[in-house]
Amino acid sequence: QLILYIKTPTGQIKKLHFTSDLGSEYNRQPFVKSKDMVSSSNFSMFEATYNELGRGFNSKKECDKEREEFIKFLKDELSKNRSVLIGVFAQARQQSMMEFLYRNFKDDPNFKYPIYIDGVLGATLNNVYLSILEGEEKEYWQEVMSWKYFHYINSYEDSMSVALRKDETKIVLSSSGMFSGGRVVNHVKTTVENKNATIVICGYQGEGTVGH
């Protein structure tokens, strides 16, 4: 969160407070620090997309259950030689999904599938994470990024090549998260035509977007 002090023309000091998405206390994301309490401010502004009633989790148990179901779903799809496309936002969602997949599959001897990370902005933000994290968190993120099953796609030509390989059993993480722009569009076009492929929507989809 951000606290900004502004001096008015009359010499008064005003305190402005901004925090990113309030989210859910049960759905903690990797590398996100515990929130600090702010006792007062002259003006506070919050994001609350994922704090809407009915959108979040009511307990840690409920959150863990959904994650377990998602892992089971991925295992079932891959065991049937299906391709899985996951639309992600380049900032935060891609990194949390990478960490989630790494944490749950790194010690699984049966997991041997390529995971393509497709998106220029997402790749840039991966390195931003690396530059701002410190200590054990920095080492862990480097470990995640270096996992042998992650394959980073840089060029548009390579992106199209992966999208057209319909018979390949794989996971693709691509942006945008609402499927309305970016390289994910090409993956969607080939995935919806493929009976052996699945599209996963894992975030808010704004009205009027393809994902919605």
What label would you give each PLM region?
Residues 1-109, 114:
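His/Asp/Glu-rich metal-coordinating catalytic cores
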Residues 70-212:
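Hard-cation-handling environments
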